[in-house]
Amino acid sequence: MKVRRPRGLLLALIGSLALAVPAGAGGAQTSDEMAYALVKEIEQHRAQTWHRQRVMGIRRTRTTFLERRVGSLELLRQLRDTWRRRAVIARKRLVRPPHRAAWLCIHRYEGSWKDPNAPYYGGLQMDITFQRTYGRYLLRRKGTANRWTPAEQMWTAEKALRAGRGFYPWPNTARHCGLL
């Protein structure tokens, strides 16, 4: 036998509770709450910027952690906007590695970006030694290359290129792409 519950009574109860809540209860934030939220945004944008810079192998942007010593909402907004801008710039640079076309050509003849099969991982088929040497930060943070984004994999390969290895870790595919 099916039990029927009175929906009208439930809706009336919810409606009366909604009217009982004071108008300002969920309203505007205090300046302390706004400052706290701004500091959290600054920290988030800074962490994103530094992560991207580390992946690219460039020095991270310096900071004085001014937001920890200042209470001015206007200054905190300016700092937030500055770090947001830096994070956007770092992201744009991250997704455009210098030899992107070459890495995409090599990838075309290698595996999927998410290839989990040992001994070679990811779209550029990097072995553990290669990942440890040129992508230690990502290997520790995310695991093997199949868990990295395509941009992170290309920047790891870019570090090997800068170190003088050239495209030789991919001898056959680099030859197909006209890189050797």
Tell what function each PLM region has.
Residues 1-28:
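Secretory targeting and sorting signals
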Residues 91, 115-116:
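A generic structural signal for short
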